[in-house]
């Protein structure tokens, strides 16, 4: 038997979250998964697009986190949209509960990765962006691209 791989292996990234939300802070949480979920996750068959986390009964749960059923699974295959429990310390859960109760703050998963063989989730405390914020981001990105393009052309000449 070989050793478990060291380091971080990214699996799924919620790229839309940085466009839709202002990220206030990040933290790492462990995931409670069943066997077929882990196998599907290792194959990269998951979607974080509409996922969000809630604090319920002193525990943190992720809802709308879709993990596709494992191809070689049988009748014991998992439900793709079942709520998944996150593993955090009690004081972190209490702090997140207080933050979640504030108006406008939400818990959004940013990415899923494997760290030393264990599934981890990068969770963010975020505030939803307004439409004008999104437009500003697009405009600044376009301006940055134009500047980079002009510098590149200037350096070629």
UniProtKB/Swiss-Prot annotation:
It is found in: Cytoplasm. CDD domains: SmpB (cd09294). GO terms for biological process: trans-translation. GO terms for molecular function: RNA binding. Keywords: Cytoplasm, RNA-binding. It comes from the Bacteria. Coiled coil: none annotated. GO terms for cellular component: cytosol. InterPro entries: SmpB, SsrA-bd_prot, SsrA-bd_prot_CS. Its main location: cytoplasm. Belongs to the SmpB family. HAMAP family: SmpB. Required for rescue of stalled ribosomes mediated by trans-translation. Binds to transfer-messenger RNA (tmRNA), required for stable association of tmRNA with ribosomes. tmRNA and SmpB together mimic tRNA shape, replacing the anticodon stem-loop with SmpB. tmRNA is encoded by the ssrA gene; the 2 termini fold to resemble tRNA(Ala) and it encodes a 'tag peptide', a short internal open reading frame. During trans-translation Ala-aminoacylated tmRNA acts like a tRNA, entering the A-site of stalled ribosomes, displacing the stalled mRNA. This is SsrA-binding protein. It comes from Syntrophomonas wolfei subsp. wolfei (strain DSM 2245B / Goettingen). The lineage of its organism: Bacteria, Bacillati, Bacillota, Clostridia, Eubacteriales. The gene is smpB.
């Amino acid at each position: 038997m070989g050793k478990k791989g060291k380091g971080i292996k990214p699996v799924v990234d919620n790229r839309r979250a940085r466009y839709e939300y202002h990220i206030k802070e990040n933290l790492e949480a462990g995931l409670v998964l069943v066997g077929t979920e882990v196998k599907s996750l290792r194959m990269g068959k998951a979607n974080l697009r509409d996922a969000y986390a809630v604090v319920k009964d002193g525990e943190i749960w992720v809802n709308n986190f879709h993990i596709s059923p494992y191809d070689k699974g049988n009748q014991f295959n998992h439900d793709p949209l079942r709520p998944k429990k996150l593993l955090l310390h009690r004081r972190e859960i209490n702090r997140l509960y207080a933050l979640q109760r504030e108006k406008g703050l939400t818990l959004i998963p940013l990415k899923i990765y494997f760290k030393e063989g264990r599934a981890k989730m990068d969770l963010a405390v975020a505030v939803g962006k307004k439409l004008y914020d999104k437009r500003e981001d697009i405009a600044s990105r376009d301006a940055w691209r134009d500047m980079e393009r002009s510098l590149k052309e200037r350096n070629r000449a």
